[in-house]
Every structure is written in C-alpha cells, then in structure tokens.
Amino acid sequence: MRSHASQMRSTFTLSALTAAISSALQAQPSTNQVIEEVVVRAHPLSAEGLAQPVAVLSGIELQRVLSTSLGETLRNVPGVNSASFGQAVGRPVIRGLGGPRVKVMEDRIDSLDVSVSSPDHMSMVEPFTADSIEVLKGPSTLLYGSGAIGGVVDVHTGRIPHVVPENLSGSFQVRDADNANQTTASGRLDGGAGNFAFHLDAFYRDADEYEIPGFAESSAMRALEEQERHNEHDDHGDHDDHGGDAEAFGILPNSQLEAAGGALGASFIGERSFIGFSLSNYDAKYGLPGHSHSHQDDHGDEHDDDHSDGHDDHHDAHGDEEGGAVLDLAQTRFDLEAGMENPLAGIQALNFRLGYNDYEHVEFEGSGEAGTVFATEALESRLEFTHDAFGFEGASGIQISSRQFSAIGEEAFVQPVDTQTFGLFYVGQRRFGELGLEAGVRYEHVDQDPSTGVERSFDLGSASLGLIQPLGERWTLSGQLDFSARAPVAEELFSDGPHLATQSIEIGDSSLNEETAANLSAMLRYGFASVDFSLSAYITDFGDFIYEANTGTEIDELPVLQWTQADATLRGFEADATWRAMGWQGGGLTFNAGFDSVRAQLDSGNNRNIPRIPPQRWRLGALFDLDSLQAEISWRRVSDQEKVGVAELPTEGYDDLRLHIGYSLDVGDNPIQLFLSGRNLTDDEQRLHTSFIKDLAPQLGRTVEAGVQMQF
C-alpha cells in the first residue's frame, strides 16, 4: 500500500499555485482595502436561472429552523429528509437518496469525516456556524464528483474572510430547551484593519437523554417480538407468561449529547485578490441509541402526558449508563482559499480551495471499555476558474482528493482503505434570445486501495444538458437531462463483518461496477406580485444501483446483508407555494404550503421496494410580521410508509405542529432577538422511515425552546 505522503503529492501540486497568487497580492497596491466580495456559491455560475433546483436558507429564516443536525435543520426544504440516529446524528437525504450519494460540504469542500461510513456517525458540519446553507437537488456530479449523484448540501461559514469589514462586528446566541435539558450557545466575531481581516466562532451544546411520547420500540417491532416469543414458546411447549425485560418508555435511553467546537480564520486582501485560511476543531461525545437492546427496569404505569417526572434522575454523567454504547470524537480541520479577479486575458476569476482534516473517534462499550476506533486523514483541493468562451459563461476546474481510512476493533466491519480521486470538469450557460442553455461534462478517476485484497480503479464520465424557457412574464419552464456515474465507496466494496449500527452482518463485493444514473427533471415556476409557486418532477433510471440485499440467513441472530447491484428507478415530484396575503408598513401576513413524494423500486424481483425511502409529506404554514414581532406556525403531515423493502417494517405517519415567536428590540445600537419555539406540540410519536433505528428510537417528544440572540 502506498504511503500517505505519496498519495497526497498530486494534491499538494495544486498548492504551488497559491504561491503565485500570494506573490501577486504582495505586488498590488493597498490603497483600497475593501474590494467587492467574490461571491462563492455551491455552483460557480449565477444561482438565478439555474435549471437545477436550488434551495437557500439564510438570515432569520435559517435562525428559525436551526437544529442539532443538518438534516433536521433542512426539514422544511421540499425533497429533503433526515437519516437520524438519535438527536446527535441527522445526515440529509435528498429525493430518497442519502449516504454516499449526497455530498455534504463546508465552504465547497467535502466534510472529510466518516459520516458516510455508518449511519450512527455524526456529520462534522455544524449548522450553528452557518451563514447560509445551500441545497442542490438532483445530480451534481459535474462539479463535485460521484459522491454527489443525489445532490449537494453546502454550508457557508464565512470562516475565511473575503473582505475587510469596516467595523468590528459579532453575534452571540444562547437557547435552552425543556426536552433533554438541552442548552446551545454560539458566537462569532468578525473584524480587521488595513489589508487583514479575521474571523472567530465557537459553539457549545449539551443535552441529556430526550423524552419521547411512548415506547422506544415501535408498535410494529413490539408486535413482531411478541410473535417471535409466542413461536418460541410453542416450539418448546412452554406456555407460561413471558416476564421479559420491560420496554423503555418516556425516555430514549442513551440519547445524550455533548459537543463543542470553534474556528479561527484570517485573510490578506488586496485590490483584486485575496488569500486566507481557517483552523477549526470539533469535539463531541454522544450516546448511540439502539446499539444495545437493554431496557429500563420499568416503564411505569404512572407515566403521564408530560412524561418528564424522574427525568433528572434518569441521566447522569453523559453516557456512563451501563449497557449504552458511546461515541467520543475529535476533529481538527485546516482550510485554505485564494482568489483573484481577471488573472489572465479571458479568465474572469480564479479560485483555489483546499481542505485537510484529521478525524478520530472511539466507540466505547457499555462497560466503558474502548471498542472500535475509526480514523481518517483526508485532503481535498479544487482549482476553479470562470471564463467566457464561444458565448458561454463557464467554469472549468480540477478537483483532487485523498482519504486514508481505518477502523480497528470489534465493530471494524471494513478494512483500512486508501482512496484517491482526480476530476476535470466544465459547466457553462448561454442565452439564445429568451432561451437559456446549460451544459457540462466531467471526467473522474477513482482508486480504492485496501490494506489486503485487490485494488479497484474506476473511470467515470458525467454530462448534463439543461434548458430554461420563460413563458411570458410570470411563468418559467426548465428541464434538465443528466447522465452521472458513481464509484462504489470502500464500505460497499470491502465490508466484511458485524455492523451493530445497522443491526446486521455486512458483506461487501469487491467486484462491484460503477453505478450510473440517467436523470430527467422538469420544473415549472410562477412568480408575480404576491404569489410564488414551483412544481418539480423527476425520474432517475439507475443502472447497477448499489444496495444491501437481505440474504435470508443469520449469524449470531444478525441478518446477513450482501452489497449487490441491480437496475432501479426513482421518480417523484415536489410543490412549494407562497402567498403574501396582506402587507402593511412594518410587516405582513404570508401563507405557505408544500408537498413532496418519491417512489423508489428495483426494476425486477419479488419485493422491488428499496428500503428507507421517505413517505409523502404535506406542509402548511403562516408567518405574521408586525414591526418587532414575528410569529410563524407550521403543520406537517407525514404519511404512513407501507411500501417497504425485504425484512423492513412499515412506519406509521405522524403530525408535526410547530410554533415560533420572535421579538426584536435594540439596546443602544445593538439589535437583540428574543424567541420562543415549540416543536411537536401535539406530542406525536414521530419515526423517520429514513432512519436505520426508526423502530428503536423515535424523534423527540413535545419540546419548548427559548433563546436570545444579540448582534453588535
């Protein structure tokens, strides 16, 4: 196996370009310290008019929906769900696709963590440090590689300044929730002088085990277990009453969470260019609900509607409960960015990004003994330049990444693997009268080098063509045809052993081929006066779709799952509407509604349903704004999911009623926002069908949160 230094040598070759940019910075006059900010988005071209659906959360809208995980924060975006694993973990699922098919990024560089490796691994991108969050729905492989075949979530942090602020500014917020006694605090500071700018941010979160409306296990799971016990009694001729363990009730065992992190960033900014860096760290310790099948002693018939009595005594010392597995992680990340306007004739802007991450976590068993150690050292860089050629506004670039991954211990279900990726891409857009045309291509080479066994290499090609046609002044019709390819990830190729997060034995297949997807999507948009409306539909035809097939056998009472391939089809549609019903000086009344649905099936077989596909969702909401007062109420109906895969249990639907009230005031020149939020106000039992542990761990019960945010 090649050394890590040699693996990354090609990546660091791009860093030499930074030296040239830095030299140019030094040669430029410093008479103008504040330049027009280089706009950096998940897409290098203008987000306005893209054929691909894009959703952006920022400002007050983002503050209203912030949650402990990225997936939960994005819950209101049509087509986006969360693959939760307790309150600590919630990776986004876009249009039914998640895991290695959705790329989670921080400032256009991959998160570089191990959240793709297992559903119980936390994503290291923190929502509370975000300036904005962008979602590219649908294939985004042209820009970001095969890991984005289902879409992209990009969190913009502002940690590397692009301009020198005129004044020192900052913000601080603290919020506290009754459920799980959760406390979150975060703050940031931005300043600078001359040609230099700096950024500081930090956050802290602490939460106990959270309260749930009823049993931890679903009714379907309890019925299945009861049937199995009945069958066992019949087999042994034993008809005595079963006196087994009492089920967890009212509190989800081992769902506690503690996390902290922060970052320092600085930039040198010239007249036409800049160079900057950021250094960040992230530490967390959280319980893994569902890792063990231990139960509390009693669920208690005295459980009342508030299900909070005795909660303070239930959780102690954050994860020291006997029988509960705990994950303890630490990450250090370094980011570098440099940009220049008009560096050469015909090139409008040049941007270089590099991210390096050193990550490790230890999974402690219930006894407190260290179990499996997951570690990764990863680096990703991209050189991107925008230009005009043949009438096209375009962006071309190079992307190189290197990842050294290892898992050592009892739950090490995959061997150490080194992954190398190299990509070349081009995307462009042009107008022909009112008709807008988008096109792009990408070539990518991926090497997977395991510690033992055969190295695999993949050559991948992707292409896209999109059209945007205005239909009068109010309507716009857009369509996009994509062909994308994805290389199998290490877990799909080389898994071989028990994986307790998925409650299974996972067997990889080192002979897997690349996965291909032909996607056709269309979007109709209406915008006029007080009404905005969009309707999207899509169909994706997968060739050699990679999935885990249940073999029907068990080892040590765990089902054996085999990574395999088959053709599959996903289809769905989304609707989103906003109506500004009333307006007055200082505010107004706005109503909104939404709907999304996705269907995913293999093209052949007895049970063709792909597991963990989200059910239909309906959303209604209203926002009232009057001077300093804002109030928002929203209701979401999540349907039953009965179209289940092999050995998958159906999931009951639920309602989610939420309320957010905010009040703004000024203390001197400093704006302050007070807010009160209520989530799951009807205390419904909410189980996410996208979660591996949905039958063992429901979402939080009724939660009331209060907080304050101050800016200066």
Residue positions per predicted region:
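Short, acidic, small-residue-rich periplasmic hinge/interaction motif at the N-terminus
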Residues: A27-Q63, G71, G99
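Transmembrane beta-barrel wall of Gram-negative outer-membrane proteins
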Residues: A180-D206, S218-P289, D328-I347, F392, ...
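C-terminal beta-signal and adjacent terminal beta-strands/loops
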Residues: P213, A485, D541-G543, E642, ...
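Short acidic/polar hinge/loop motifs at secondary-structure boundaries
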Residues: D110-P139
